[in-house]
């Protein structure tokens, strides 16, 4: 026992000694970290290990370079410091010097054997880091020592020029141009997959969608409602029949609702593709950075002003999307194509219209650097196509709006109508806008002006008064107040949902029918019966119809006006005070059915 006790004490002593020696080994790095040149010199004179690492792998040379201490760096190199060593994160002394843009230390490190083309984590190079910093002298040293001007990182395939352009370092970009860097280089394609495609499935709704697309291919337009009715299996149930909660077993025979669902559920859906696509160029990076001077350098050097990214983002689209209107103006003056759209069909005119009436909720909104209406006038003066139609929903549309307003096929005029932007609507009309162009789901400008797609607290509206006048304008232009979208909704459904009482009165006075039902709302979950129920405009006003994830909001005054107008029209209005929890709605009521 005695011997074992002594051995235990000896082992403990060895362990403590090892800890003490390990701690002592960091003294050189610690002194450099403290910027204590005298202590460091004393340690080196005693033969301390110049390459001893701290816990994170940092050596004295890392700290000297990081602190920008040229004399300490030279001292450590003279004592044998490894200029190529990396810490645990992969940072080398040259990485740190390049990030700092320290030309003098970069030169010393290269003289001591560092590699100007060393590959750092994620494939980055010292020249990329110096370019991001915009340090011209540091860049020159690296380039003079053979740094690859067109090296690409392994994460996004970006080059030094892209790093400089992204930070708006015009002088750094000019230097790279002068040294022969590739102006037309592109970053790698986006690694993320595209969104869900609307393809074949076992859902009968997909079959309906294919039938609709066949008509589009043959006739160049969507089928009218009579064609969709004829496509049904005539089981008599329609949207009020026995709906199955499982869409794959949907045999309700209501192909109108199925067509709407195939094109996006309750009338809306999110974007169908990722909107970056990768393949950005230095010019697109410069536009995204709102660096007019960098854009100027690249254009003067011969960059194509209409080059596009993988998704089709041109410099003008990027500038417009980000509200950099002065840059957009400059690009237009240099000859940018005002009608060049990306894969979503988004044009500068549509994006500027959307920006003027931006939704709240999902995106922080920067102020424009130029009056938005003046910018739109500039686009129009350059020949913007006022009737260009969207292919995909815009990037700023919130999930709430996407769930019941599908922007495919929309024009800038329809988008302006959604926000009751009377001034812009009139401007677009003056330039040839066709007010009767609908979305692919047959949603009209009148419907969105009345409230289809309205989300409380999200949708932008110029004013209630202006919206009323916008609705009046659309009626005067001949838009049909009883036109139904492929969801079955009419303008009155939107006005009821929004609680736009004066709009309701105006629409009814111009012939809007109050007994028109939609074709069922897939967003009323609760029960299959409720999901299949069809709704009157007054039901929307009573807050019985939920659209997407937004809550249904009751508008008692609008409901009261609906009932008065229905009585005047000889219609039997539903009882007041209805709620889904307390009453049984006639069409879905049965003896043994009790709403949840």
PLM region spans:
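Conserved ankyrin/ankyrin-like repeat signature
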Residues: 39, 71-72, 104-105, 137-138, ...
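Ankyrin repeat boundary signal
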Residues: 52-53, 83-86, 116-119, 149-153, ...
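Bacterial N-terminal signal peptides
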Residues: 9-20
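Ankyrin repeat start-site detector
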Residues: 56, 88-89, 121-122, 155-156, ...
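Ankyrin repeat A-helix N-terminal signature
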Residues: 30-34, 63-69, 96-102, 129-135, ...
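Disordered, low-complexity segments in secreted/periplasmic proteins that are enriched in proline
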Residues: 192-274, 581-596
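Ankyrin repeat domain, specifically the short helix-to-loop turn at the C-terminus of the second helix
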Residues: 44-49, 74-82, 107-115, 140-148, ...
């Amino acid at each position: 026992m005695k011997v074992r006790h002594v051995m235990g004490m000896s082992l403990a002593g060895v362990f403590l000694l090892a800890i003490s020696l390990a701690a002592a080994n960091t003294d050189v790095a610690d002194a450099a970290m403290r910027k204590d040149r005298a202590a460091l010199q004393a340690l080196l004179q005693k033969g301390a290990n110049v390459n001893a690492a701290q816990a994170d792998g940092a050596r004295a040379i890392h700290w000297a370079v990081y602190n920008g201490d040229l004399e300490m760096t030279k001292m450590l190199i003279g004592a044998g410091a490894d200029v190529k060593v990396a810490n645990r994160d992969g940072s080398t002394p040259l990485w740190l010097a390049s990030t700092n843009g320290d030309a003098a230390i970069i030169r010393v490190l290269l003289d001591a054997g560092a590699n100007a083309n060393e590959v750092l984590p994620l494939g980055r190079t010292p020249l990329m880091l110096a370019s991001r910093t915009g340090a011209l002298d540091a860049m020159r040293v690296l380039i003079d020592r053979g740094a690859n001007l067109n090296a690409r990182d392994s994460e996004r395939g970006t080059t030094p020029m892209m790093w400089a352009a992204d930070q708006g370092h015009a002088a750094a970009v000019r230097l790279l141009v002068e040294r022969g860097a590739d102006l037309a280089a592109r970053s790698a394609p986006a690694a993320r997959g595209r969104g869900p495609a609307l393809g074949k499935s076992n859902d009968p709704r997909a079959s309906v969608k294919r039938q609709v697309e066949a008509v589009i291919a043959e006739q160049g337009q969507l089928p009218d409602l009579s064609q969709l009715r004829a496509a049904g299996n005539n089981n008599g149930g329609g949207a009020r029949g026995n709906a199955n909660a499982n869409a794959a077993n949907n045999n309700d025979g209501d192909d109108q609702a199925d067509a709407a669902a195939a094109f996006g559920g309750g009338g809306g859906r999110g974007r169908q593709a990722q909107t970056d696509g990768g393949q950005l160029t230095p010019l697109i990076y410069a536009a995204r950075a709102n660096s007019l001077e960098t854009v100027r350098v690249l254009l003067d050097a011969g960059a194509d002003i209409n080059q596009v990214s993988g998704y089709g983002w041109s410099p003008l689209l990027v500038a417009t999307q980000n509200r950099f209107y002065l840059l957009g103006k400059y690009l237009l003056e240099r000859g940018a194509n005002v009608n060049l759209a990306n894969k979503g069909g988004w044009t500068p005119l549509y994006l500027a219209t959307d920006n003027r009436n931006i939704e709240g909720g999902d995106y922080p909104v920067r102020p424009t650097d130029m009056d938005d209406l003046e910018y739109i006038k500039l686009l129009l003066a350059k020949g913007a196509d006022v009737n260009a139609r969207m292919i995909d929903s815009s990037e700023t549309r919130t999930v709430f709006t996407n769930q019941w307003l599908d922007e495919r096929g929309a024009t800038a005029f329809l988008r302006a109508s959604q926000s009751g932007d009377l001034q812009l609507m009139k401007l677009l009309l003056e330039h040839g806008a066709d007010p009767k162009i609908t979305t692919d789901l047959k949603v009209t400008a009148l419907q969105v002006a009345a409230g289809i797609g309205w989300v409380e607290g999200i949708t932008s509206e110029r004013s209630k008064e202006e919206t009323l006048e916008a609705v009046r304008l659309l009626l005067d232009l001949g838009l049909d107040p009883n036109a139904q979208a492929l969801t079955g909704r009419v303008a009155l459904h939107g006005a009821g949902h929004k609680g736009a009482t004066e709009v309701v009165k105006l629409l009814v006075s111009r012939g809007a029918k109050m007994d028109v039902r939609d074709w069922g709302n897939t967003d009323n979950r609760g029960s299959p019966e409720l999901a299949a129920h069809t709704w009157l405009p007054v039901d929307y006003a009573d807050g019985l119809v939920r659209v997407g994830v937004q809550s249904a909001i009751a508008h008692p005054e609008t409901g009261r006006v609906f009932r008065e107008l229905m009585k005047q029209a000889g219609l039997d209005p539903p009882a007041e005070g209805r709620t889904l929890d307390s009453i049984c709605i006639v069409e879905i009521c049965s003896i043994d059915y009790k709403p949840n």
